[in-house]
Structure formats: C-alpha cells, structure tokens
C-alpha cells in the first residue's frame, strides 16, 4: 500500500476559519495515524482575494496548533513548488489543460462577460440576497479549429473549459457518503484556466494532488457537487483518484452556516476571546467526529492514536459555545501553574493595579473560569470597592439580614483591628472563633464579612482569602464603610 500523504491547501485570504482548521486537523490526523506525510500547499490562484500577511497567519496557526507539516514551501522534499502561483509559472497547468483540449475533454472559450451575463439564472436566495448561477451553453465548443487558432493569434482573451458529456452519469465514492451518482446533464463546463492564465481552484487541485501523490483529500461537503467534475478529470488523464473524505457543515446554534459575523468563526477570534489552543483543537476535532470511547478530552497525541476517519458523521455539526467554554475550563484546570499564570497575568493586570499578591488572585480564579476573559469581571473589586445595595446582606440560606449582618461586622471589627498578621489562617481563626463563641451558623458570620470586603454577590475565594489579599488597612476600611451603610439604613 502506498504511503499515506495528505495535504492542507489553504488560500491566504485572511484569518483561518474553524472549518479550514478542522480540515487541516483531520488531514494531519489521517496522515499521522498511518505514519504518513502531512503537506502544506498554498493555493493563491485567486489573485484578487489575496490578503497581505495571510500566509504568515497560516504558518502561525498551524505552528501554534501543533499541526507541523512534513513538506511545504519551507520544506521542499522533491514535490515542489508548494505555492500554486510558483507552480503556475512553470506552465504545468496550461500544459495539462492543452492536453485535455487535444483529447476533446476541454475547449477554448472566447465568450465575453456580456454574453455570459445573458446565461445567468436565479436559483433562490442566500443570506437574504438572490443567488444566480451561470450554466454555460457550450457555444465555443462548436468553433472550428481554424476559428480557435485565429482567435488565439489575434490575442483574444480566453478561458479553457472542461467538456462535460450531456448524457449518461458520473459516479464517485466518498469515504463518508458512499457512492454518489449524478446525471452528466447537470454538470457545468467548468473553467480550468482563467483569462489571466491562472488555473481555477478546482483544476489546480487535481493537477497538484496527482503530482504530489496525495492519497487522501479532506474537504467540506459543499464540494460534493464539484467532485464528479474532478472524477472526470482524473479519468481523462488516466490517473488514480485519491480517497475522498467530505466533512459535514459546521453551523451555529441556530443551525445556520457559521459565518464571520458570528464573532467566533476563526482560530484567532477564539484566541482573542480567551480560549486556549489545546482546547480549540480538541473541540474542533469533535465537530463531526467522535471516538469509540466516551472520552471528550484528547491531547493532539491522543487524537492521532484515536482518529478513524470512517467515524466522521454526515449530519451538520453545531458549534456549541457552551461546550467549548466547558472544555476550555477543563484545560485551564489541568494547566501547570507556570503556564496558567502566564495566560492569567495580563487579564489580572487589566483590573488590578495595586500591589496585591497577583499569583494568589490567579490561583483563586483558576477552577472558576472557563476562558481567561472571565477573570477581569470576577476580580475587579480588589482595586476598587464597587457600589452595592445593602439588600445583598439579606440571604435566606445564610439566615442573614441587615440587622444581624450589622451586629456581626460591629463585633468582628475590633478583633480585626487588633490582628497584626493578615494571613488566611489568622483571619479564619478570628472569624471561626467568633462564630463558635456566639453559637451562630458559619454562613451567618462569613456572609456579611465577605459582602463587606467585596461588594459582590459571588467572588473567587471567601472572606479569609479576600481580606488576606487586601491587607489590614483596606479590609478595615471596607468593613467600616459597610457598618456605616447598614447603620444609616436601619
């Protein structure tokens, strides 16, 4: 059996969409599961859509996610060039397009934009706008050899189109969807070489996949409709087709196609929203694939061992933000303290500017956050006591109200004034001693103090930890503010 070779072939048109990242991940996993090679190829044939700096984004993303390629523009192993514009300069695409013309499998088309406009027909709506398609009518197929040569000699702009049969059927096999057969009459004569001399995405893919000896091709199921055209190209050349693996659509929670407007459609969007790379990769692996085990948390190495592309689903995969947040939280909990602190510190510094123990604050929130952007809102009370309503002192479960909260604060204030060491254990000793002496429930003694020093309904850590971080002076100041608030309301 031939060595498994897969390729990730992105276009440098901006940030990497999660659908593209899933394709890269699946290509990587298929290759590595079988001990094969994972190739990076840059598809820049659509020159109008190129975005400056987008190639660097591709390199940065695959490096950060650990999807290290064995071959690519920076690692030529004899199958290069690995950038399509560089391959185009060698004349390879035009050479094979002309071979198809000679065999009657393709033809020159000289139709103007104006003529092509007349062939357009509406096919419904997409994103609120009417969608049109142009099905070519084979007009230029009927030009004589002399007419074609005269047009070429005159420098008339042209494209080269694939010549599809109008009768019969074409079948191909997909690893997920099985054998699919289409009527040839439904297939358009797609363009192979554009008027600028560049190949189309579809044609370049077939040529490059063949000469790079690609064995498995992963792509979104929106390409299922184009695959019969690829099949006919492979047959026309007498080449063996790769294994096709078409992945299900990724939708948002409303079951609509995940778009850039969602705000979390790209890898970089998710990083900016406080998600960690390992969690993103793990989550994206499960968008359409599931393990035979019930496990959901996988390292990249574990995914390589577990991944079996025959377990990819056909049905659309929902990008469930709640599940991603949960998974991210699990990864944060498992992070080693040094790496975690490196991620958490910039978020802590956004809201904590005073000389507090930031490492202690980071440790308090570690098991409570799902993304790093959750941190700021949880700890913003350290720098500045927020305005709060005294209704917060009334808590049915804790059996507290304004009156008994005021008494607790007035009673513990002198004890804290006398305390010199504001360690967690010292503060705990004072409060638990007071609770025991007065025969009250823990919540009755702790809730008023925590509320007073934080001004918040929920906090990372309790009264002991918060007061230890704030220190004596600030803790006492906040307790006195609370006493004044409660006294003036009664």
Swiss-Prot record:
Cross-referenced Pfam families: Anticodon_2, tRNA-synt_1c
The protein's organism comes out as: Lachnoclostridium phytofermentans (strain ATCC 700394 / DSM 18823 / ISDg)
Query: Which chemical reaction does it catalyze?
Result: tRNA(Glu) + L-glutamate + ATP = L-glutamyl-tRNA(Glu) + AMP + diphosphate
Q: Where is this motif: 'KMSKS' region?
A: 257-261
Spell out where the chain crosses the membrane: none
Q: How is the cofactor bound?
A: Binds 1 zinc ion per subunit.
Where it sits in the cell: the answer is: Cytoplasm
Q: Where does ATP bind?
A: 260
Q: Which cofactor does it need?
A: Zn(2+)
Quick one: which residues bind Zn(2+)?
109, 111, 140, 142
One GO term of the biological process aspect = glutamyl-tRNA aminoacylation
- Short motif ('HIGH' region): ranges: 10-20
GO MF annotation: an example: glutamate-tRNA ligase activity
Q: Name one GO cellular component term.
A: cytosol
Q: What does this protein do?
A: Catalyzes the attachment of glutamate to tRNA(Glu) in a two-step reaction: glutamate is first activated by ATP to form Glu-AMP and then transferred to the acceptor end of tRNA(Glu).
Question: Might you give the EC number(s) for this enzyme?
Answer: 6.1.1.17
Q: What keywords were assigned to this record?
A: Aminoacyl-tRNA synthetase, ATP-binding, Cytoplasm, Ligase, Metal-binding, Nucleotide-binding, Protein biosynthesis, Zinc
Q: What is its main location?
A: cytoplasm
Family, according to the entry, reads as follows: Belongs to the class-I aminoacyl-tRNA synthetase family. Glutamate--tRNA ligase type 1 subfamily.
Q: What is this protein called?
A: Glutamate--tRNA ligase
Q: What is this enzyme's class at the first EC digit?
A: ligase
What is annotated about its quaternary structure and interactions?
Monomer.
């Amino acid at each position: 059996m031939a060595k498994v070779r897969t390729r990730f072939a992105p276009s440098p048109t901006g940030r990497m969409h999660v659908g593209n990242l899933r394709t890269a991940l699946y290509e990587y996993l298929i290759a590595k599961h079988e001990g094969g090679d994972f190739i990076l190829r840059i598809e820049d044939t659509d020159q109008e859509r190129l975005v400056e700096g987008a190639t660097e984004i591709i390199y940065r993303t695959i490096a950060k996610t650990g999807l290290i390629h064995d071959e690519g523009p920076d690692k030529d192993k004899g199958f290069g060039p690995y950038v399509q514009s560089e391959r185009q300069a060698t004349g390879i695409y035009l050479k094979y397009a002309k071979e198809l013309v000679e065999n009657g499998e393709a033809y020159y088309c000289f139709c103007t934009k104006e003529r092509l406009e007349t062939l357009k027909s509406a096919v419904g709506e997409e994103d609120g706008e009417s969608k049109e398609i142009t099905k070519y009518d084979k007009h230029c197929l009927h030009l004589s050899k002399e007419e074609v040569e005269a047009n070429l000699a005159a420098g008339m702009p042209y494209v080269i189109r694939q010549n599809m049969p109008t009768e019969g059927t074409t079948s191909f096999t997909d690893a997920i969807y099985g054998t699919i057969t289409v009527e040839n009459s439904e297939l358009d004569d797609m363009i192979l070489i554009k008027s600028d001399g560049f190949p189309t995405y579809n044609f370049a893919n077939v040529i490059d996949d063949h000469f790079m000896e690609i064995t498995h091709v992963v792509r979104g199921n929106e390409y299922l409709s184009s695959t019969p055209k690829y099949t006919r190209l492979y047959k026309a050349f007498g080449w063996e087709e790769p294994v096709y693996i078409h992945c299900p659509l990724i939708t948002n929670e409303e079951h609509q196609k995940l778009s850039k407007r969602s705000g979390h459609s790209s890898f970089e969007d998710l990083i900016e929203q406080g998600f960690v790379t390992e969690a993103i990769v793990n989550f994206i692996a499960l968008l359409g694939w599931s393990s035979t085990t019930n496990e959901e948390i996988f390292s990249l190495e574990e995914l390589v061992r577990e991944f079996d592309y025959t377990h990819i689903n056909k049905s659309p995969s929902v990008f469930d933000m709640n599940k991603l947040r949960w998974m991210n939280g699990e990864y944060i909990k498992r992070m080693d303290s040094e790496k975690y602190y490196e991620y958490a510190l910039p978020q802590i510094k956004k809201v904590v500017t005073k000389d507090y123990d930031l490492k202690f604050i980071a440790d308090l929130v570690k098991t409570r956050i799902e993304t790093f952007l959750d941190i700021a809102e949880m700890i913003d009370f350290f720098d500045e006591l927020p305005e709060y309503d005294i209704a917060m002192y009334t808590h049915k479960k804790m059996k507290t109200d304004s009156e008994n909260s005021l008494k607790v604060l007035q009673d513990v204030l002198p004890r804290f004034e006398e305390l010199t060491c504001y360690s967690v254990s010292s503060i705990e000793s004072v409060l638990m001693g007071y609770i025991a002496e007065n025969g009250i429930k823990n919540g009755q003694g702790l809730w008023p103090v925590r509320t007073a020093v934080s001004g918040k309904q929920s906090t990372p850590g309790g009264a002991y930890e918060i007061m230890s971080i704030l220190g004596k002076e600030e803790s006492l100041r906040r307790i006195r503010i609370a006493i004044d608030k409660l006294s003036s309301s009664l």
